[in-house]
């Protein structure tokens, strides 16, 4: 049971609701790209992102404390035609009836997509460009066969990154990041191909930062508008706090635990609008959030109970995000999973134990709301407190499948063997599903997933699928003819 009526109500809506396709982001992205033909790709993408931040509806749902949504629905499944649109066109007429991960999509939305979105992207999507570069027989194996799962890697973005809250995002905020990029842009002369590319990058950073800051401003304005007409004084106070939080973050460094929670969600939401990437990991949440928690509790601004409610609200936000995938991908990755791996516990950079009050709150929030996100991981070391081990065991005993338990020393050793410094290796977090990872580096842990069982099947069945009879493998002879 959730810690409050608020989070329990949101949890029930999450559990019993079916995600709905939103065409808004795709429509904005398409119109922006029509307007920026001929400009550098990073700049075009940044302008499309900024347009989405400025035009998508700023919706605050009843009772919310953490705000921000990628479409007009609480669980919006957005489309990414610049990555891939052909599978959506083939499958969207049966989205609501497929057995795994169905989506609601109206006839009007389908007609709009086919008339106003797909025509522009025909021949321009990442999918089409990628498949054209491959031999035909190879390309055929990569799409919806269950033999080589490659299509899930380019129908939506694969993130496999951990935002650096400790050293970049929280200390600077997006305004300072923007100003630094603008300074680099001004200092970089357009006198070489390399510098022209650098200028495009810096320009795109400026535009993207302006976009995410404007998105937050719009939520602040909407919260203020709702507060002005709110009759309930308690809810009015909450809306005013939301307005203040969104006026502050993510443009500026957070000052309170609530601001830090909202900052984290704006980072996730920005990535959703940009690429909808899976495996965008919140990282070592209990480490970078604890200073705000401790300061607020000491100052009397926050109670552990209120902190738990805020974390539950954030967990629900993580779970409302929808990874829009094909029916074939859903057969293997069912559950609307985004693989947002959040890690608690483990050693600090100096080698001391990092378990704190927030580590326990994260466990309790996961047990309370019972959401599928974030993917909660715990790091267990030889000096882990017994109380934390018992709390982890209690959560495991509920049968939820959380948390994933990882050997702290093994994770650090893997990064040491990869060449990381000891302090960085000790600061590892889990990435996606699942690999030890450090927040200052990106990863690409799998360009394709190989079904070795299918390889054996084709070898023993003359290169043909036992499901369809289609010859997809090498034309091997019958097994009884093997020497």
Where does each model-flagged region fall?
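Conserved catalytic cores of very large enzyme subunits
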Residues: 2-205, 234-241, 245-483
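Extended non-globular scaffold/tether segments
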Residues: 203-214
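Solvent-exposed, amphipathic alpha-helical segments
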Residues: 222-226, 292-295
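A conserved hydrophobic secondary-structure block that centers on an alpha-helix together
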Residues: 226-234
């Amino acid at each position: 049971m959730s810690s409050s009526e608020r989070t329990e109500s949101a949890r029930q809506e999450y559990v019993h609701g079916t995600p709905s396709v939103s065409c808004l982001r795709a429509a904005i992205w398409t119109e922006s790209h029509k307007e920026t033909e001929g400009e550098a790709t990073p700049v075009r993408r940044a302008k499309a992102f900024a347009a989405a931040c400025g035009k998508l509806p700023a919706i605050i749902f009843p009772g919310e404390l953490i705000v921000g949504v990628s479409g007009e629905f609480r669980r919006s499944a957005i489309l990414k035609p610049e990555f891939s649109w052909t599978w959506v066109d083939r499958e969207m007429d049966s989205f609501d009836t497929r057995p795994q991960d169905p989506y609601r999509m109206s006839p009007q939305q389908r007609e709009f997509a086919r008339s106003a979105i797909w025509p522009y992207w025909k021949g321009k999507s990442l999918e089409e460009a990628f498949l054209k570069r491959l031999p035909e027989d190879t390309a055929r194996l990569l799409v919806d066969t269950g033999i080589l799962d490659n299509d899930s890697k380019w129908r939506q973005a694969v993130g496999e990154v951990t935002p650096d809250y400790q050293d970049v995002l929280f200390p600077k905020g997006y305004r300072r990041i923007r100003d630094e990029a603008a300074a680099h842009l001004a200092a970089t002369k357009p006198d070489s191909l390399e510098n022209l590319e650098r200028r495009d990058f810096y320009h795109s950073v400026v535009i993207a930062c302006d976009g995410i800051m404007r998105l937050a401003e719009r939520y602040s304005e909407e919260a203020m508008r709702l507060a002005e007409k709110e009759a309930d004084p308690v809810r009015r106070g909450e809306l005013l706090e939301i307005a203040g939080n969104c006026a502050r973050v993510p443009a500026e460094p957070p000052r309170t635990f609530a601001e830090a929670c909202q900052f984290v969600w704006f980072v996730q939401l920005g990535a959703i609008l940009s690429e909808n990437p899976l495996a965008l990991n919140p990282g070592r949440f209990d480490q970078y959030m604890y200073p705000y928690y401790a300061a607020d509790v000491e100052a009397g601004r926050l109670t552990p109970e209120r902190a738990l409610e805020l974390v539950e609200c954030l967990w629900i936000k993580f779970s409302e995000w929808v990874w829009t995938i094909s029916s074939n991908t859903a057969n293997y990755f069912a559950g609307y999973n985004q693989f947002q791996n959040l890690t608690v516990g483990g050693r600090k950079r100096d080698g001391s134990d990092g378990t704190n009050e927030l580590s326990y709150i994260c466990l309790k929030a996961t047990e309370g709301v019972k959401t599928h996100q974030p993917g909660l991981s715990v790091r267990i070391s030889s000096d882990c407190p017994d109380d934390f081990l018992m709390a982890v065991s209690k959560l495991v005993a509920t049968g939820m499948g959380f948390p994933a338990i990882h050997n702290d020393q093994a994770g650090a050793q893997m990064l040491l063997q990869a060449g990381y410094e000891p302090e960085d290796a000790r600061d590892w977090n889990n990435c996606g599903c699942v690999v030890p990872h450090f927040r200052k580096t990106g990863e690409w842990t799998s360009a394709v997933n190989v079904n070795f069982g299918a390889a054996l099947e084709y070898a023993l069945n003359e290169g043909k699928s036992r499901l369809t009879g289609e010859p997809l493998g090498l034309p091997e002879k019958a097994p009884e003819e093997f020497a």
